[in-house]
């Protein structure tokens, strides 16, 4: 769990973590130089529970870097990430560990709750959730959130080090899809708290845009495609990703046509996260003749 100035909801989340029914767990809490009482709260828990390892960042490093510190410190064969303001159901880890099978990563549905903890719906009400069996599923996006994941150690070498310009859960999911795939578990196992200080909210279609111009947007997409191509194991999927990165870097008609043909050929995989019909995802690929998205 990564913490930063989260004392308002922290005790409730830590209590839910320590109450997990799975028999053998270690808890790694990494505080990112909080200025509130978060660190003191964690120290009090660590003094009472030998399963807790507490790491203190001397200076603030940000959420992504803090999660990487925690992952590198983990000793278990499977790892789960926790936000500081949610509440886990007691059976979360046990059910996911039992269901992960040969997959590299499994993620659950989440219940949405308001700032007071009252459940208001499901994450799947706003987002299409599905399996991601191969790397091409991550070309345009994904709806697998980090707080709902359980993943195997086998993905760490592909996923780390994290890049600051993409989400940590995105690259973890991509690494898993590149190896033995990502499995969706439809049961809600986390109360995902929605409030004004969320880093990412439940409706991913309304996320903050990290660009101001089309040129800047295109440059970010190329950078992301180059990253995942470099992390993808050798094979046909890696070559497709490299080709897309080259084509997205150019605005020429030839490049737009090439990326359209590539996406049209692989539209089921690349647009799986949108939950469109087969025809709908095919027609969506025509947009690439005009723009990136």
Task: List PLM regions with ranges.
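Nucleotide-sugar donor-binding/catalytic module of glycosyltransferases
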Residues: 1-205
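C-terminal subregions of glycosyltransferases and related glycan-biosynthesis enzymes
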Residues: 165, 170, 193-293
């Amino acid at each position: 769990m990564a913490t930063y100035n989260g004392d308002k909801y922290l005790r409730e989340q830590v209590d839910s973590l320590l109450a997990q029914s799975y028999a053998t767990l270690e808890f790694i809490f990494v505080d990112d130089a909080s200025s509130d009482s978060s660190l003191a709260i964690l120290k009090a828990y660590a003094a009472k529970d030998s399963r807790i390892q507490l790491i203190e960042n001397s200076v603030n490093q940000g959420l992504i870097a803090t999660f990487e510190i925690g992952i590198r410190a983990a000793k278990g064969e499977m790892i789960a990430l926790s936000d500081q303001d949610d509440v886990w159901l007691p059976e979360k880890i046990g059910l996911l560990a039992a269901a992960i099978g040969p997959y590299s990563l499994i993620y659950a549905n989440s219940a949405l709750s308001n700032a007071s903890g009252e459940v208001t719906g499901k994450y799947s009400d706003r987002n299409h959730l599905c399996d991601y069996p191969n790397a091409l599923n991550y070309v345009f996006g994904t709806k697998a959130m980090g707080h709902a994941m359980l993943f195997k150690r086998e993905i760490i070498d592909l996923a780390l080090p994290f890049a600051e310009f993409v989400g940590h859960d995105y690259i973890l999911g991509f690494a898993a899809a590149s190896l033995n795939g990502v499995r969706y578990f439809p049961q809600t196992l986390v109360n995902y708290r929605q409030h004004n200080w969320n880093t990412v909210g439940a409706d991913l279609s309304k996320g903050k845009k990290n660009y101001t111009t089309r040129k800047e947007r295109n440059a970010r997409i190329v950078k992301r495609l180059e990253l995942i191509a470099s992390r993808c194991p050798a094979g046909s999927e890696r070559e497709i990703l490299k080709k897309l990165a080259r084509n997205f870097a150019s605005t020429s008609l030839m490049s737009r046509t090439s990326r359209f043909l590539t996406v049209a050929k692989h539209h089921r995989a690349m647009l799986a996260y949108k939950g469109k019909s087969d025809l709908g995802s095919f027609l969506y690929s025509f947009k690439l003749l005009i723009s990136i998205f």
